Amino acid sequence: MSSYGGGGYSSRGGGGGYSGGYDRNGGGGGGYSGSNGYSGGGGGYGGGGYGGGGGGYGGGGGGYGGGYGGGGGDRMSNLGAGLQKQNWDLDTLPKFEKSFYQEHPNVAARSQAEVDKFRRDHAMTVAGNNVPSPVETFDEAGFPRYVMDEVKAQGFPAPTAIQSQGWPMALSGRDVVGIAETGSGKTLTYCLPAIVHINAQPLLAPGDGPIVLVLAPTRELAVQIQQEITKFGKSSRIRNTCVYGGVPKGPQTRDLSRGVEVCIATPGRLIDMLESGRTNLRRVTYLVLDEADRMLDMGFEPQIRKIIGQIRPDRQTCMWSATWPKEVRALASDFLTDFIQVNIGSMDLAANHRITQVVEVVNESEKRDKMIKHLEKIMEDKESQNKILIFTGTKRVADEITRFLRQDGWPALSIHGDKQQNERDWVLDQFKTGKSPIMVATDVASRGIDVRNITHVLNYDYPNNSEDYIHRIGRTGRAGAKGTAITFFTTDNSKQARDLVGVLQEAKQHIDPRLAEMVRYGGGGGNSRYGGYRGRGGGGFRGGRSQGANGPNAMPMGNRRW
């Protein structure tokens, strides 16, 4: 077998290839069928609405009934109790290839001083035995033609820092830890070596599970990973599926039974599929843990350990994380062997220095007026294609703010855990494409949602800690761009003042004198249970809870502003 599988990938042709991209979890005719959408309100906002006449958001085989929390149960710690622990005998397991890297002559010719300078210039540190030198161009990475054609078609000028160092590491077959900020290009860092890995393995037989398994903390991130793998794997006819909770299992089960080379999954739904015999992990030889710190934050460690116990121990494992806390280090030491590590940027959690941070000390009653003033300034140039992500502390406040903004004529939509999956997908699409350039979100969106060109983040409510603050504002200023983060800080947040000032000082940002005063004099209050505006439901809000598509996202938009 050649190092890149030779003609292996071409023989993957036949058999139907990739059947339908990530959309195939939909069906026909379901979706959101109401006639609400944006059709009202003086011409409204983009006729047709959400579902309904004129297409709207595509089908869904009867719709996605259960909404968030249905079916998947990703947080149930007793998941996996029925999984049998595997006793692996490596002598009897089929052999497989995982080392494909051949150093390019240009890379081999560079002196250690040149390598060290490149790493310094890109804020890159490495650790471990025999770490390969970074590559500086796509051609130096040594990917086969069928991969490079896809990369060049995307128009990327050069590898990002994490790709420069991560590609040689992953292609070498070694276990890898990569620490880099969200938006650094890490998805491609493991996706492209995964495609090479798959094409060097025997074709799937009936009943085989996937060859590559990617675990992700949220369904939004899982879907985005799937989009990248679909894009770059199509020339190899690599099939994939995305397995996550909150939607019916039928389409996911059908994909798994037909056979997929790549499975992208959230931990809970994957265990559900394993326990029910819908798939197995016996063929997995390339395992990816994406946003490992976030998965541990969300309480998935027991599920991750159960899943890894179902995978042969001589697999290749790649772990990616934005931070490197002791919990992630423990997971790496338990499941990675002689791993090599690359860190981009400081190992300490710090804010992106390309982001201008504006922190305003306000009263709760001032928040809405101040938000509107900021929006007026940001959106006054309609040609600027600004995108604004507004974070709230609760789902209730997210819906109230969205309702308020839409009534005031702003193109705003909300996303949070109580929204049904197809509505969340639709909202994300509207935001990504700029059709609705304002998105209101809870922390479900603070990691894992990869929307490019977000120009502004507005923290309507301050989060529970400075780490979440850094991750929230990190949605802007990505891929070398600049961004602005505006934060409303109240006396209820005073316990967080010292940490916030530390973040601002490290990034050399202006500090509101009232914020500095909170640090000097301490201050009580703690965290308010509800971070948002109290008692102002906004005109026309009948009833106190979001009704999904009949809630704030379905309200006709006033035509006063937009």
Swiss-Prot record:
InterPro entries found in the cross-reference section: DEAD/DEAH_box_helicase_dom (IPR011545), Helicase_ATP-bd (IPR014001), Helicase_C-like (IPR001650), P-loop_NTPase (IPR027417), RNA-helicase_DEAD-box_CS (IPR000629), RNA_helicase_DEAD_Q_motif (IPR014014)
Region (Disordered): 538-562
Keywords: ATP-binding, Cytoplasm, Helicase, Hydrolase, Nonsense-mediated mRNA decay, Nucleotide-binding, Nucleus, Ribosome biogenesis, RNA-binding, rRNA processing
Protein name per its UniProtKB record: ATP-dependent RNA helicase DBP2
Cellular component GO terms held in the UniProt record: cytoplasm; nucleus
The keyword Cell inner membrane is annotated on this UniProt entry: no
PROSITE patterns per record: DEAD_ATP_HELICASE (PS00039), HELICASE_ATP_BIND_1 (PS51192), HELICASE_CTER (PS51194), Q_MOTIF (PS51195)
Organism: Chaetomium globosum (strain ATCC 6205 / CBS 148.51 / DSM 1962 / NBRC 6347 / NRRL 1970) (Soil fungus)
Quaternary structure and partners: Associates with polysomes.
Molecular function per GO: ATP binding; ATP hydrolysis activity; RNA binding; RNA helicase activity
Gene3D superfamilies the record matches: P-loop containing nucleotide triphosphate hydrolases (3.40.50.300)
Localization (cell): Cytoplasm; Nucleus
Documented EC number(s): 3.6.4.13
Enzyme class, broadest EC rank: hydrolase
Residue ranges of domain Helicase C-terminal in the record: 370-519
Positions of short motif DEAD box: 290-293
